[in-house]
Amino acid sequence: MLVDLIARKMREEGYTIVAMEGNLLPLPEDEKIPIPWKIRRHRPDVIGIGMKSRRVCIGEAKTHDDLFSRRTATQFGDFADIIGKSSGEKAELIVGVPLRSRDTLLQLLEKMKLHAEDISIILMPEELADDENEDHL
């Protein structure tokens, strides 16, 4: 569900989804969106392209526990390498987390010296996050 919210925000901001983990978008029967390609060592959940601006948007969903992992730190570091370098324009990063994880995410971004103007945050209400976790059990 969080990946869907990230994809929706991308579309609202004018990006066309070109790759998405799980292929959850409603598409005609014959069409599929490819899984995202790796950015350095990591594959994001969603990639969008601004067809007019040619900007890239990277979307990544994280659980609360993910925010404490070394993998998340290296992943954000890899993504940060292209923020500001996409076709001479700034690439955007959208991160989705459960509402309770907001402060933890902000602390991680600050520790990594990733600036808020390059990153959008989507906060998912706990009730929805709990439902999503139950679906994966």
Where are these predicted regions, by residue range?
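Domain-level recognition of nuclease-like catalytic cores that cleave nucleotide substrates
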Residues: 92-137
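Conserved catalytic cores of phosphodiester-cleaving nucleases, focusing on short active-site segments
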Residues: 44-69, 79
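Arginine/glycine-rich "motif VI" loop of SF2 helicases in the C-terminal RecA-like domain
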Residues: 80-90, 114
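Well-ordered, non-membrane alpha-helical segments in soluble/globular domains
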Residues: 1-4, 70-80
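Active-site metal-binding core of divalent-cation-utilizing nuclease and nuclease-like domains
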Residues: 16-53
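Acidic-and-aromatic substrate-binding clefts and catalytic sites of carbohydrate-active enzymes
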Residues: 38, 67-69, 99-101
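Structural motif
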Residues: 21-23, 62-63, 97-100
